[in-house]
Structure formats: structure tokens, C-alpha cells
Amino acid sequence: MNLKPLADRVIVKPAPAEEKTKGGLYIPDTGKEKPMYGEVVAVGAGKMSDSGQLLAMPVKAGDKVLYGKYSGTEVSVEGEDYLIMRESDIFAILA
């Protein structure tokens, strides 16, 4: 992937949507819920503080993160779907 986020932005590869229910029924594309977690694939340099210092990003490539249902902007690069979001849109790092 040739995509480098700027400032405090993060690129996340969303987890795949569930294909079937726990009971074994297949879910059509129109009924699938958007996943709210994924893997960070790239991180910007960070945000500038009011005093001019560069604040380090708390997430890094490879982290599994939890984010809001409507967070980020969807982009497709080389046939793969990604979300570009601000670091503040990420709720937690999954351990």
C-alpha cells in the first residue's frame, strides 16, 4: 500500500463483516453490520501541540483498535478497503 497518513491521522483495515449468524444463517450484504474494529496499517507523524511540540501517536502499525461506527473516511486502494481517521476517533487498543 502506497498511502502515508498526515498529522494525527491513522489508516485502519477494518475487520471483515460477519458472513453468517451464530445460528448458521447467511447474512446478505444489505444486512451486514459495519465492523467497529480493525488493524492499524499506517500512522501519521503526530499532532502539533499549542506550544509547537510534536505529540507522539499512542497507536502504531499492527495494533488492533476499536473505533466508532461512523468514524473515518472509506477509501479503496489497489482493491483493498481502508478507513482514514483521526487518532481521536479511536476508542481503545485491543489487547
From Swiss-Prot:
It holds the Pfam family Cpn10. Keywords: Chaperone, Cytoplasm. It is found in: Cytoplasm. One of its GO terms (molecular function) is ATP binding. Gene3D superfamilies: GroES chaperonin. It comes from the Bacteria. GO terms for cellular component: cytoplasm. GO terms for biological process: chaperone cofactor-dependent protein refolding. SUPFAM superfamilies: GroES-like. PANTHER family: 10 KDA HEAT SHOCK PROTEIN (PTHR10772), CO-CHAPERONIN GROES (PTHR10772:SF58). Belongs to the GroES chaperonin family. Together with the chaperonin GroEL, plays an essential role in assisting protein folding. The GroEL-GroES system forms a nano-cage that allows encapsulation of the non-native substrate proteins and provides a physical environment optimized to promote and accelerate protein folding. GroES binds to the apical surface of the GroEL ring, thereby capping the opening of the GroEL channel. Heptamer of 7 subunits arranged in a ring. Interacts with the chaperonin GroEL. This is Co-chaperonin GroES. The gene is groES.
